[in-house]
């Protein structure tokens, strides 16, 4: 099993690479790519960790050597948020980066499962899909927007509020991956209930958690370590499913049947070919249903922006 991390010299990429070096199954290969010249050195640094995961680093304009034979590609390349920016402000820079890298994936490892971490995810996933489609290699079961950070934040905040162990809480989060499009299904957590006010406040905190980190870092960065952990969790789940483990379920942002929007985050059963089944989002509370209806315009607009970037 070979996993490639693109954008591996950045804050998320280095954290993700460290976690994968420690947690990938024995015998796996990990390849790191970034435009930054430090990348081969990051791989050398990580190579001193005594796990049976082979690691190599590549830098420069060409990601091809890192992508050859990859089963899973995780893309965290791009610029990070600064105070006062929201994820959509990143679009102008990151759209071109994702387009370029996905074009290289289409040529080099078109059958790989691709997880997009680069924000704005609502839009960059649509860009990736259109690039793969143009190249004639698009498989909607193999392209994911990694929204796992919304899930782990929800788990943490719910556990804090309700005095639970964070490891016993699993909150499904649907919709997209920015602002109002992030919708935690708090009504679906077994054995936990919320007042309407608690649900509204907690939903808002989860939606704005990224901004909380950006402001706390006072201009020194965005959520890199928690995002690295979230991306590692998703990547490792994908690897387990590709290797034949049954019953692996994660929420991610994928193309579905278009019931709500072309791309939508929902619980997925993962399998040997990527998405095995898009699971139902279940019954929503009145607050959740209202939030879902209210976000769809924003989500569809974000998606359209990505489609137009490639097709216009």
UniProtKB/Swiss-Prot annotation:
Binding-site list for NAD(+): 7-13, 34, 94, 117-119, 227
Catalytic activity, reaction form: (S)-malate + NAD(+) = oxaloacetate + NADH + H(+)
Quaternary structure note: Homodimer.
UniProt keyword annotation of ATP-binding present: no
Taxonomic lineage of the native organism: Bacteria, Pseudomonadati, Pseudomonadota, Gammaproteobacteria, Enterobacterales
Cited function: Catalyzes the reversible oxidation of malate to oxaloacetate.
SUPFAM superfamilies xrefs: LDH C-terminal domain-like, NAD(P)-binding Rossmann-fold domains
InterPro entries: L-lactate/malate_DH (IPR001557), Lactate/malate_DH_C (IPR022383), Lactate/malate_DH_N (IPR001236), Lactate_DH/Glyco_Ohase_4_C (IPR015955), Malate_DH_AS (IPR001252), Malate_DH_type1 (IPR010097), Malate_DH_type1_bac (IPR023958), NAD(P)-bd_dom_sf (IPR036291)
GO cellular component, one term: cytoplasm
Family note: Belongs to the LDH/MDH superfamily. MDH type 1 family.
A GO MF label: L-malate dehydrogenase (NAD+) activity
Active site location: 177 (proton acceptor)
Amino acids binding substrate: 81, 87, 119, 153
Protein name: Malate dehydrogenase
One Pfam family it belongs to: Ldh_1_C
Enzyme Commission identifier(s): 1.1.1.37
GO BP, sorted A to Z: malate metabolic process; tricarboxylic acid cycle
């Amino acid at each position: 099993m070979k996993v490639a991390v693109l954008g591996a010299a950045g804050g998320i990429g280095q954290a993700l690479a460290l976690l994968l070096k420690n947690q990938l199954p024995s015998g796996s290969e990990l390849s790191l790519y970034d435009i930054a010249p430090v990348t081969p050195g990051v791989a050398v640094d990580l190579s001193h960790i005594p796990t049976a995961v082979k690691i190599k680093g590549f830098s420069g304009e060409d990601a091809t050597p890192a992508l050859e034979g990859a089963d899973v590609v995780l893309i965290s390349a791009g610029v990070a948020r600064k105070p006062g920016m929201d994820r959509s402000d990143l679009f102008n820079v990151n759209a071109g980066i994702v387009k370029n890298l996905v074009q290289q994936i289409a040529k080099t490892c078109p059958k790989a499962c691709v997880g997009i971490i680069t924000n704005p995810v609502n839009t960059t996933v649509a860009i990736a899909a259109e690039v793969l489609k143009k190249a004639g290699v698009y498989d909607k079961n193999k392209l994911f927007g990694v929204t796992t950070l919304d899930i782990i934040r929800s788990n943490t905040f719910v556990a804090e509020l309700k005095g639970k162990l964070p490891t016993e809480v699993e909150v499904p989060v649907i919709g997209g991956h920015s602002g109002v499009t992030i919708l935690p299904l708090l009504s679906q957590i077994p054995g936990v209930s919320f007042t309407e006010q608690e649900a509204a406040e907690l939903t808002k905190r989860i939606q704005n958690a990224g901004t909380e980190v950006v402001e706390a870092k006072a201009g020194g960065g965005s959520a890199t370590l928690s995002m690295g952990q979230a991306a590692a969790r998703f990547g490792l789940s994908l690897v387990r499913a590709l290797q034949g483990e049954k019953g692996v379920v994660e929420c991610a942002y994928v193309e579905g049947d278009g019931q709500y929007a072309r791309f939508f985050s929902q619980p997925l059963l993962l399998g040997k070919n990527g998405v095995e089944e898009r699971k139902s989002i279940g019954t929503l509370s009145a607050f959740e249903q209202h939030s879902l209806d209210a976000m769809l315009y924003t989500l569809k607009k974000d998606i359209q922006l990505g489609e137009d970037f490639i097709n216009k």
